Curated annotation (Swiss-Prot):
Belongs to the MinE family. This is Cell division topological specificity factor. GO terms for biological process: cell division; regulation of division septum assembly. It comes from the Bacteria. Keywords: Cell cycle, Cell division. The keyword Flavoprotein does not apply.
Amino acid sequence: MSLFDFFKNKGSAATATDRLKLILAKERTLNLPYMEEMRKEIIAVIQKYTKSSDIHFKTIDGNQSVETIEVEIILPK
């Protein structure tokens, strides 16, 4: 593969394959069986150290294979 091949347009089959990979990666990350248990454990640890019950999770789309979960914690005064 040369440097010029890098900038060459992909064919429709390659583009379709890449799109399918994106869809499968997204579906795989959404259906992980341990995600709900992990969220509960994270909430328990946060509550143990902060005494906060106002905890929110938000899913943020990352790159092709990574999905980010943002945790928002409202601390009591």
